[in-house]
Curated annotation (Swiss-Prot):
This is Putative F-box/FBD/LRR-repeat protein At4g00315. Residues 358-410 form the FBD domain. The lineage of its organism: Eukaryota, Viridiplantae, Streptophyta, Embryophyta, Tracheophyta. GO terms for biological process: negative regulation of long-day photoperiodism, flowering; regulation of short-day photoperiodism, flowering. Residues 1-47 form the F-box domain. Keywords: Leucine-rich repeat, Repeat. PANTHER family: F-BOX/RNI SUPERFAMILY PROTEIN-RELATED (PTHR31900), FBD DOMAIN-CONTAINING PROTEIN (PTHR31900:SF28). LRR repeats lie at residues 57-82, 87-115, 137-164, 165-190, 211-236, 243-271, 293-318, 319-344.
Length: 441
């Protein structure tokens, strides 16, 4: 008799829960005792994005039977990653049935759907999904139609991810969010024509919000009423022609309508349009800020009275030629800044052009934060061959009086001789405290 036969079923099910679902199912061939143990698994994951036609023929039946035969009192997590339509035998009706079974019979707590289809229309989900009392996490990705009924209530939903889905009408998203009374984390990604013009987020309980928009999605405007928000990330990489000339702040076709966000602590902006005043008006009280502005004009950010008194951490992307202008304005406006990092977003377009005299013309006097508060300075991928970047680095190393650590990374493509020359030049510029640790990589 093998030792596993002496273990209780509860322990064996726990062991199976660490395996991928397809491997857990294979254990049913071991013996009669193992035959149905996998049906007690609290988490089910089906990833069939890469299967042959012959494999796809029995796939729909297998998933249906496994959900019908599921024995656990509740499904903690159900994940479906499927590729169907032109090949295989999975149909939209199958998806509809599986979601219905998970919602009706299994009190699912986390549901994740990623559908890559060849169908003419996105897949419609059952109305019962939008009335599920047990679901806490809902993730919908790709070819899915968010068709929200008039009567909708998700009393337990705390996390919602909507990635590149299609909405049945203009009000679908607003109707959905308005009936999630405890929602805390929301992610909306858009990169297609999805029937959504105005992006309206009115959720009193929301604490984290991530919005990502890229071509060719259309957007008339953003309306936000999120008084409990602590973290905000907005990525808008559409071109101006895709945004209906949103740079015109008086344009009626594109607007921002933000209510106060008194609890906001952290913001992350990746923006490629000029009219960003509305964003900064509501983030002046944050503690952590990350910025990448693909199109920058002085009047778009800096105006009388803009001060970040509580800002302690600043990350700024150096991918654009005018980034140092933005940095100088922020240093002047952030008297209590403690951490500064310059970086480049991975896979981000490089728009840098060397403007050697740009930095020297920006600051009339040393910003207060350099004299009294900045403790950490980090620069990832510093292109020392660009004189503008060398000027910025030398200025900070020369004037940061309270610095505790400075770390600068050069591109790996630089020759050792080139790196050594840059390190020597930067080292000679350093006039910070003797206790400061300076690292070059």
């Amino acid at each position: 008799m093998d030792k596993t036969s002496q273990l209780p079923d509860e322990l064996l099910v726990k062991v199976l829960s660490f395996l991928p679902t397809k491997d857990a199912v294979r254990t049913s061939l071991l013996s009669m005792r193992w035959k149905s143990l996998w049906m007690w698994l609290p988490k089910l994951e089906y990833d069939f994005r890469h299967y042959s036609v012959s494999e796809g023929q029995g796939l729909a039946r297998f998933i249906t039977l496994s959900l019908l035969g599921h024995k656990a009192p509740a499904i903690e997590s159900l994940s479906l990653k499927l590729r169907y339509g032109a090949i295989g035998s999975i149909k939209p009706e199958d998806i509809y049935l599986w979601v219905s079974l998970a919602v009706h019979d299994s009190n699912v707590r986390e549901l994740s759907l990623k559908l890559c289809t060849f169908a003419e229309r996105p897949t419609k989900l059952p109305k019962s999904l939008y009335k599920c009392k047990s679901i806490v996490i809902l993730k919908l990705k790709d070819e899915i139609l968010v068709d929200v009924p008039r009567k909708v209530c998700l009393p337990s939903l705390k996390t919602l991810f909507l990635g590149r889905v299609t909405y049945s009408d203009e009000d679908s998203l607003h109707r959905l969010l308005s009936n999630c009374p405890v929602l805390e984390d929301l992610v909306v990604e858009r990169d297609r024509i999805d029937n959504l013009g105005k992006l309206s987020v009115v959720v009193k309980s929301l604490q984290r919000l991530t919005l990502k928009m890229s071509c060719p999605c259309h957007l008339d405007g953003i309306m936000m009423n999120t008084p409990s928000l602590k973290y905000l990330k907005v990525t808008d990489e559409r071109q101006e022609s895709d945004s209906d000339n949103e740079s015109d702040s008086d344009s009626p076709r594109y607007f921002y309508d933000f209510e106060d966000m008194p609890k906001l602590e952290e913001a992350d902006f990746v923006l490629t349009f000029q009219n960003i005043k509305k964003f900064f008006k509501f983030v002046t009280s944050i503690k952590r800020l990350s910025l990448c502005l693909g199109v920058y004009t002085e009047e778009s950010l800096y105006h009388e009275g803009l001060v970040f008194n509580q800002l302690e951490q600043l990350k700024i992307c150096s991918c654009d030629s005018d980034w140092s202008i933005l940095l100088s304005r922020l240093l002047e406006s952030s008297p209590n800044l403690r951490e500064l990092e310059a970086y480049v977003i991975e896979d981000h377009p490089d728009r840098r052009v060397d403007l050697p005299n740009q930095w020297g013309n920006q600051l009339n006097c040393v910003p207060k934060c350099l004299l009294s508060s900045l403790e950490t300075f980090k620069w990832s991928e510093m292109y020392g061959l660009l004189q503008n970047q060398m000027d910025v680095a030398k200025y900070i190393l020369r004037n940061a009086r309270c610095l505790k650590s400075a770390t600068i990374f050069f591109p790996t493509t630089y020759a050792k001789e080139t790196r050594d020359e840059m390190i020597e030049e930067l080292s000679l510029s350093f006039q910070g405290p003797e206790t400061c640790q300076v690292f070059f990589h």
